[in-house]
Amino acid sequence: MSKNYHIAALPGDGIGPEVMTQALKVLDAVRNRFAMRITTSHYDVGGAAIDNHGQPLPPATVEGCEQADAVLFGSVGGPKWEHLPPDQQPERGALLPLRKHFKLFSNLRPAKLYQGLEAFCPLRADIAANGFDILCVRELTGGIYFGQPKGREGSGQYEKAFDTEVYHRFEIERIARIAFESARKRRHKVTSIDKANVLQSSILWREIVNEIATEYPDVELAHMYIDNATMQLIKDPSQFDVLLCSNLFGDILSDECAMITGSMGMLPSASLNEQGFGLYEPAGGSAPDIAGKNIANPIAQILSLALLLRYSLDADDAASAIERAINRALEEGIRTRDLARGAAAVSTDEMGDIIARYVAEGV
């Protein structure tokens, strides 16, 4: 590849710097194996930025992200900053403004049960044995969380609260295309989640998704009501490939998908805008209780790097190489402490070294 790429690395707080270090080790292996020209710059964010710059999202960090092709984000937050006003705390003061600034409208959350980790799945053993590999595609900027009017009024028995579910055609079209394009890189199936038997917004959602599906004749489309989808995820998650969801339904289903994998330390996420620019981060938190102990699981951060390569740099071969390396490590029984269950565990650094080596070797 001849193009030059630049990644803004925002390690953040807690275990963020430790797991970011491992992801950048793997990036070095990718660079060398695939002859990719990728540079990185580090910027403070979250609590680290509060300590060093007096605010959770300094202008220099935003400017650095603007100059990058993608952002690799660690994690933010911790008890040290909980005394601050909510808007000045690391989570609300950094991550949400970044999403708004870059107009990140789609959230991608993979949820995969890896071979050898079936015992961590809370589902019945016969269901877990089938495995699953799901991508939840959630619309981030529309729907009931942002629709107007919303508020409270009245008093006594007449006091009421209200929210409004609003979706525009363009919002549904663009998130649907993300889902169908993602399915083309996977197993060619989209299941669109709605409540079209009740909600006008869901009726429009279904109509427009059907229209977009005609542009993707190679991708199978199914529709499912949200209540049935929550049950089917427990009954047989292996039936799903890509789940296409509104903001509210995706908020619910992405967490359900995460829970049935059994380990938050394995779950990456991506938030994208219309230009393909993305912010990539682990789905878990900053875990301040284990920070600095070299025991955190870096796989979610490394998988976030794989998503970055696939979606923002269009380097699917490199992303797949990372995923194969992780599969090999897990198949060989290599575990960090969260997955060891009393067996021998490797450190954060050791897991990063192993995955980077497997990428370099082309396993």
Curated annotation (Swiss-Prot):
Cofactor binding: number and manner: Binds 1 Mg(2+) or Mn(2+) ion per subunit.
The keyword Flavoprotein belongs to this UniProt entry's keyword annotation: no
Subunit details: Homodimer.
TM stretches of this protein: none
Cellular component GO terms held in the UniProt record: cytosol
Official protein name in the record: 3-isopropylmalate dehydrogenase
Entry EC number(s): 1.1.1.85
Coiled-coil positions: none
Keywords recorded for this protein, A-Z: Amino-acid biosynthesis, Branched-chain amino acid biosynthesis, Cytoplasm, Leucine biosynthesis, Magnesium, Manganese, Metal-binding, NAD, Oxidoreductase
Record's keyword annotation contains Metal-binding: yes
InterPro entries on file: IsoCit/isopropylmalate_DH_CS, IsoPropMal-DH-like_dom, Isopropylmalate_DH
Principal subcellular localization: cytoplasm
Compartments where located: Cytoplasm
Molecular function GO terms recorded: 3-isopropylmalate dehydrogenase activity; magnesium ion binding; NAD binding
Binding site for Mg(2+): 227, 251, 255
Lineage, top ranks: Bacteria, Pseudomonadati, Pseudomonadota, Gammaproteobacteria, Enterobacterales
Pathway(s) where this gene product acts: Amino-acid biosynthesis; L-leucine biosynthesis; L-leucine from 3-methyl-2-oxobutanoate: step 3/4
Cofactor section: Mg(2+); Mn(2+)
PANTHER family: 3-ISOPROPYLMALATE DEHYDROGENASE
Site (Important for catalysis): 145, 195
Family to which this protein belongs: Belongs to the isocitrate and isopropylmalate dehydrogenases family. LeuB type 1 subfamily.
Binding sites annotated in the UniProt record for NAD(+): 78-91, 285-297
GO terms classed as biological process: L-leucine biosynthetic process
Function: Catalyzes the oxidation of 3-carboxy-2-hydroxy-4-methylpentanoate (3-isopropylmalate) to 3-carboxy-4-methyl-2-oxopentanoate. The product decarboxylates to 4-methyl-2 oxopentanoate.
